[in-house]
Amino acid sequence: MVSNLSQLEEVNVLVSDANWAWPEALRRIFRPRGVNLLVAESASEFVHIIEKKRIHTTIVDMDSEQSNGLATIRIIRIEYPLLPCILLTSTAGKSLLGKALQLDVFSVIDKPVDMHILREQLNRLFLKKYNSSLFGDPPRIRN
């Protein structure tokens, strides 16, 4: 079922915590669009947050110090099999891509993350899943 985000009160994206500037970089994409950024440190925290709030997508770091990204997605899939997940990784080999495909990961993005590519993938995801161009390019002003 496709739902239109214009009917929703809030849009929530849940991401892996990081010891680098990752959350702040995401805020630069999300804040102008009115998207709430929620951060989880572990697989159990991901599930706990998903149980409490409507989450529209997750962005999971394969290289998280707290938990393996694929293991986190596997745990999410137990209770939330349709929740879209994007996986970030510094080592996107065939084995990892095969496992991500088995877990129905929406997209695998290489690290360091190109924020333009991430925004494009979020736009594809939100168009497909929610019929929303929330992450599309801002309209250009013509003179």
Predicted regions located by residue number:
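Alpha-helical interaction/dimerization surfaces of two-component signaling modules
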Residues: 28-33, 49, 99, 121
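Alpha4 helix (beta4-alpha4-beta5 surface) of REC/receiver domains from two-component response regulators
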Residues: 71, 92-108
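Acidic, metal-coordinating helix/loop segments flanking the phosphotransfer/catalytic sites
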Residues: 39-57
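Non-catalytic signal-transmission and effector/linker regions of two-component phosphorelay proteins
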Residues: 1-29, 38, 56, 78, ...
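A Lys-centered signature of the CheY-like receiver
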Residues: 111
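Conserved phosphotransfer microenvironments
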Residues: 59-76
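Conserved phosphotransfer cores of two-component systems
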Residues: 51-53, 76-82, 103
